[in-house]
Curated annotation (Swiss-Prot):
Intracellular or extracellular location(s): Cytoplasm
Gene, per the UniProt record: uvrB
Domain of life: Bacteria
NCBIfam families recorded: PRK05298.1, uvrb
Protein family: Belongs to the UvrB family.
InterPro entries: Helicase/UvrB_N (IPR006935), Helicase_ATP-bd (IPR014001), Helicase_C-like (IPR001650), P-loop_NTPase (IPR027417), UVR_dom (IPR001943), UVR_dom_sf (IPR036876), UvrB (IPR004807), UvrB_inter (IPR041471)
Molecular function via GO: ATP binding; ATP hydrolysis activity; DNA binding; excinuclease ABC activity; helicase activity
Limits of the UVR domain: 627-662
Biological role: The UvrABC repair system catalyzes the recognition and processing of DNA lesions. A damage recognition complex composed of 2 UvrA and 2 UvrB subunits scans DNA for abnormalities. Upon binding of the UvrA(2)B(2) complex to a putative damaged site, the DNA wraps around one UvrB monomer. DNA wrap is dependent on ATP binding by UvrB and probably causes local melting of the DNA helix, facilitating insertion of UvrB beta-hairpin between the DNA strands. Then UvrB probes one DNA strand for the presence of a lesion.
GO CC annotations, alphabetized: cytoplasm; excinuclease repair complex
Domain Helicase C-terminal: 435-601
Name of the molecule in the record: UvrABC system protein B
Free-text domain note: The beta-hairpin motif is involved in DNA binding.
Source species of the chain: Streptococcus pyogenes serotype M49 (strain NZ131)
């Protein structure tokens, strides 16, 4: 039985106190949650401290909370911030554990079967296990997740029921414990002691939980009774202290007992017979042979090992679900009365909606051509309506809430005031006639003041032509296009901040990590061309890029005023008016945000000094040199992950993949 520690409240630690309109936003959100309001929107302008407000709300309502972001980088940033705010509570990180993932697929036009290929990040796998075990053991839990949280995970009941509970004085033989550990997918390894392993030394069993990376546990027996349980350092074996209760959760999230396994195998065999009969009646003999061979091999592995590669494709049978029934996900590990917060909801909710369709199209092809049983279709992400069925209470957080969020609630809490006193930028609308000369004059003014400029265009050709023109005019300019890899992108932003160049041109400059305080001018070309990047939401996001500088200014070049432009201008003016009034009433003088400039990632070669990426010619490196570079990067990636700098770790991961693809 798992003893759930449910009496520990969230304790927020911060040197800041709520300011601006944060107190009003916090109070409104908390009152609405405690009053039973199901959905509400926190409409927070860029730079107003939305994460701090979210933390205050969590500490006051005291509910287990799931925070969902739309990519790993943002999830990592939020995780780091919440860890600082709640050092005494369980702040967990749950994203896809693949550094690299090529899903299983079949392309009938070329008769090409692509086998699943992946590289699992051990650190993230540990954090995923830490998240699920924390949810089952305690209530003071915040899980920061990507949309991976809506993918199938295995039954929380099986996961909890399979847990091994140990106490000093408990009557259990050493061999019984060893068998129980094997049943929950722990491996015996007396040499290489790592996560998900155990080792045996006489009457002493040492176990390394899947959710830990530095600490393991030593269980000492006296006959058929546990004499003592100690927490130890996994590397040195040094005792940290005694524990009075140890719960060991399975080493994999897909786990089942022997009885359920045989029932599951019987269902798999029945489905196989049915599908083989269908293929043979349609004359699809190759597909039938392919399916029989693969499925029978998987069944043999399940019987002998309790696990097989791709076991998740049989999850419907393992979980005892009906066809079409949604899979268990991370959301099922939470208690019923939990809180969901959706960060950047205008992006994240769109992702949640789109995950299901893409997954089904790929898997249907595998089923049609005999690579998988039809039940594989039920190993899938949740549909949006299935996600909604898990929602007890939800807060959508965005500077520009989407239509979906607005349709879910009329309760909108605004957070417009920035603690720094910074205002939303002033906006000019100018004719596109003579825009190049006008823009050049504006850029030169910024260069003279050591400030930077963003220019956003709608087409690649326009961006390239503008880059060439500005270079001819003597402007230090760069164009950031979609082919640029993550690490190069980070270097470009860094060089812009350092003044290596003064102007950055791009098509979509809304992506994360583009907040540059040195930017005082944002120029929007073709502002009157309605579409994804020129709708009201896209324009407000782009305008926000100039809201980090006290001299922030936006110029829209257009031949007519569109409805989207007018709404974006009106909304910005409304916010600016509120901000000016607040600053005047409280004697606040706006100041440009001060933000440290992170150094470049460098790769240490054995016989050379540290060499940054831009100084290295990877293509001219020998295979051996590239291997050394990869090994050095992997070490630095692990160090970054241990320091909870997942943004840096993700950049290193991307560079490692680039290097591997060169071999």
């Amino acid at each position: 039985m798992i003893d759930k520690r449910d009496d520990k409240p969230f304790k927020l630690k911060s040197k800041y106190k709520p300011s601006g309109d944060q107190p009003q936003a916090i109070e409104s959100l908390v009152d609405n949650i405690e009053g039973g309001e199901k959905a509400q929107i926190l409409l927070g302008a860029t730079g107003t401290g939305k994460t701090y407000t979210m933390s205050q709300v969590i500490s006051k309502v005291n509910k287990p909370t799931l925070v969902i972001a739309h990519n790993k980088t943002l999830a990592g940033q939020l995780y780091g911030e919440f860890k600082e705010f709640f050092p005494d509570n369980a702040v967990e990180y749950f994203v896809s554990y693949y550094d690299y993932y090529q899903p299983e697929a079949y392309v009938p036009s070329s008769d090409t079967y692509i086998e699943k290929d992946s590289s699992v990040n051990d650190e993230i796998d540990k954090l995923r296990h830490s998240a699920t075990s924390s949810l089952l053991e305690r209530n003071d839990v915040i899980v920061v997740a990507s949309v991976s949280c809506i993918y199938g995970l295995g039954s929380p009941k099986e996961y909890a029921d399979s847990a091994v509970s140990l106490r000093p004085g408990q009557e259990i033989s050493r061999d019984t414990l060893l068998n129980q550990l094997v049943d929950i997918q722990f491996e015996r390894n007396d040499i290489d002691f790592q996560r998900g392993c155990f080792r045996v030394r006489g009457d002493v069993v040492e176990v390394f939980p899947a959710s830990r990376d530095e600490h393991a546990f030593r269980v000492e027996f006296f006959g058929d009774e546990i004499d003592r349980i100690c927490e130890i350092e996994s590397l040195t074996g040094k005792t940290i202290g005694e524990v009075d209760h140890l719960v060991l959760f399975p080493a994999t999230h897909f786990v089942t007992n022997d009885e359920h396994m045989e029932q599951s195998i019987a269902k798999i065999q029945a489905e196989l017979a049915e599908q083989l009969q269908l293929f043979e009646s349609e004359g699809k003999l190759l597909e039938a042979q392919r399916l029989r061979q693969r499925t029978e091999y998987d069944i043999e592995m399940l019987r002998e090992m309790g696990y097989t590669s791709g076991v998740e494709n049989y999850s419907r049978h393992m979980d005892g679900r009906s066809p079409g029934e949604p899979p268990y996900t991370l959301l099922d590990f939470f208690p019923e009365d939990f809180l969901i917060m959706i960060d950047e909801s205008h992006m994240t909710m769109g992702q949640i909606k789109g995950m299901y369709n893409g997954d089904q199209a790929r898997k249907q092809m595998l089923v049609d051509y005999g690579f998988r049983l039809p039940s594989a279709l039920d190993n899938r992400p949740l549909r949006r309506e299935e996600f909604e069925s898990h929602v007890h209470q939800i807060v959508y957080v965005s500077a520009t809430p989407g239509e979906y969020e607005m349709s879910q609630t009329n309760t909108i809490i605004e957070q417009i005031i920035r603690p720094t006193g910074l205002l939303d930028p002033e906006i000019d609308v100018r004719s596109s006639m003579g825009q190049m000369d006008d823009l050049l004059g504006e850029i030169n003014q910024r260069v003279a003041r050591d400030e930077r400029t963003f220019i956003t265009t709608l087409t690649k050709k326009m961006a390239e032509d503008l880059t060439d023109y500005l270079k001819e005019m003597g402007v230090k300019v760069k164009y950031m296009h979609s082919d640029i890899k993550t690490l190069e992108r980070t270097e470009i932003i860094r060089d812009l901040r350092l003044g290596v160049f003064d102007v950055l041109i791009g098509i979509n400059l809304l992506r994360e990590g583009i907040d540059v305080p040195e930017v005082s001018l944002v120029a929007i070309l073709d502002a009157d061309k309605e579409g994804f990047l020129r709708n009201e939401r896209g324009l407000i996001q782009t305008i926000g890029r100039a809201a980090r500088n006290v001299d922030g200014h936006v110029i829209m070049y257009a031949d007519k005023m569109t409805d989207s432009m007018q709404r974006a201008i009106d909304e910005t003016a409304r916010r600016r008016e509120i901000q000016i009034a607040y600053n005047k009433a409280h004697g606040i003088v706006p100041q440009t945000i001060k933000k440290d400039i992170r150094g470049l990632i460098s790769i240490s070669k054995t016989s050379h000094n540290d060499i940054s990426k831009e100084e290295m010619d990877y293509e001219s490196m020998s295979r051996g040199e590239r291997k050394e570079a990869i090994n050095a990067l992997q070490k630095q990636m692990q160090e970054a992950a241990e320091l909870l700098d997942f943004e840096l770790a993700a950049q290193m991961r991307d560079l490692i993949l680039e290097l591997k693809l060169m071999d």
